[in-house]
């Protein structure tokens, strides 16, 4: 083949040489999937012929027990937050949240066209205790439930937050739920997000290095106390 492209759960797969005979591509598995994800691969030959393959890719780790979804764990954390985050939203607030969600999605989509900017493994944004893991259930004020699509790190207001890897700052904003946010485009479809900051210390377009300070821990948005919520996206999917 002279050209290979793929698609997995609406996110492009960018193939690159692994060795003289094999190719590899980075992809993501949605949290609600059971035990595998389907990828569609097209191979174009020098003759102009195109072959299509539909691949079912199994998880590298054990799937949840029967009847338990990744998106809905067996137990959930019950949290108390400002009532404005759990009462019925007015139309203006709902529209704001949707605009902010679309901004985050657009950063993920644009990252698919950014070349890979990192060479080192991804690092933790803080060397502190993890207080909540990816995929755990959340119930706010006994009413609003959701899945926690990120990792929370303990921190006091004003403590530093560091970039997980090299990349370009794609978004700095103040969101209703996430508070003050910074999104970094690392290329090859990967974006990391840093939520609830008291003070972002970077601007859109800045190139940041792995371990560079990008902001300060805070308690903005829907929180119970100051901490860092760290998230990652691959294209349209929020990933662990």
Descriptions of predicted regions:
Residues 54-178:
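Surface-exposed, glycine-biased beta-strand/turn segments
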């Amino acid at each position: 083949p002279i050209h290979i492209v793929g698609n997995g759960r609406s996110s492009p797969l960018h193939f690159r040489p692994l060795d003289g005979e094999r190719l590899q591509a980075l992809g993501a598995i949605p949290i609600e999937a059971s035990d595998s994800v389907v990828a569609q691969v097209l191979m174009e030959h020098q003759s102009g012929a195109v072959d299509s393959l539909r691949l079912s890719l199994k998880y590298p780790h054990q799937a949840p027990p029967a009847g338990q979804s990744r998106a809905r764990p067996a137990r959930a954390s019950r949290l108390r937050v400002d009532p404005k985050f759990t009462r019925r939203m007015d139309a203006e607030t709902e529209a704001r949240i949707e605009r902010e969600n679309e901004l985050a999605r657009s950063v993920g989509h644009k990252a698919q066209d950014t070349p890979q900017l990192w060479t080192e493994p991804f690092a933790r944004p803080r060397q502190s205790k993890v207080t909540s893991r990816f995929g755990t259930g959340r119930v706010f004020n006994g009413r609003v439930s959701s899945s926690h699509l990120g990792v929370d790190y303990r921190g006091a207001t004003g403590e530093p937050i560091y970039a997980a890897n090299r990349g370009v700052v794609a978004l700095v904003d103040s969101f209703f739920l996430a508070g003050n946010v910074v999104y970094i485009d690392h290329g090859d479809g990967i974006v990391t997000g840093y939520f609830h900051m008291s003070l972002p210390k970077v601007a859109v377009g800045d190139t940041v290095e792995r371990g560079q300070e990008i902001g300060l821990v805070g308690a903005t948005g829907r929180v119970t106390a100051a901490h860092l919520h760290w998230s990652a996206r691959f294209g349209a999917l929020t990933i662990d």
